[in-house]
């Protein structure tokens, strides 16, 4: 009997330069998980967002105060989220860091030898579900 890999919800995978803290300036691949136990809804800001009017999470407006990524935790946005296995998520992360000078999407850049980081964020990634997804992604990246 073949083991079926569990799928996890995520809102986005992208590559950018770390902009905060000790690792400011380090190229980083990001995976933003979906759902959060905190539900910090806008700190008094009105939420006019109706998810039915959007087809992609990228089209949602960014709030100007409070949690600027409510789409990553509010259940009403679940239909806009991706849902994949850790193996597929690992492939998407590698694809996000591929460039002309790093065509294989390596975390150690083949030319500059600069390390790239992987950051798990959004939706309380260290809760049990996020931990399982993160470990599955690490295992898939090791292959």
Where are these regions (language model features)?
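Short N-terminal binding/cap micro-motifs at the start of the first secondary-structure element
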Residues: 17-23, 39-40
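Residue-level signal for inorganic ion chemistry
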Residues: 31
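Conserved Radical SAM active-site core
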Residues: 2-12, 27, 38-143
């Amino acid at each position: 009997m073949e083991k079926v890999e569990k799928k996890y919800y995520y809102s986005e995978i992208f590559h950018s330069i770390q902009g905060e803290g000790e690792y400011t300036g380090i190229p980083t691949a990001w995976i933003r998980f979906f759902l959060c136990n905190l539900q910090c809804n806008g700190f008094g800001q009105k939420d006019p967002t109706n998810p039915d009017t959007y087809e992609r999470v990228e089209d949602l407006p960014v709030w100007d105060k409070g949690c600027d990524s409510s789409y990553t935790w509010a259940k009403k946005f679940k239909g806009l989220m991706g849902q994949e296995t850790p193996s597929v998520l690992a492939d998407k992360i590698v694809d996000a860091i591929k460039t002309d000078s790093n065509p294989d999407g390596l975390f150690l850049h083949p030319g500059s030898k600069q390390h790239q980081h992987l950051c798990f964020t959004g939706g309380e990634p260290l809760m049990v579900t996020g931990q399982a997804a993160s470990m599955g992604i690490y295992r898939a990246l090791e292959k």
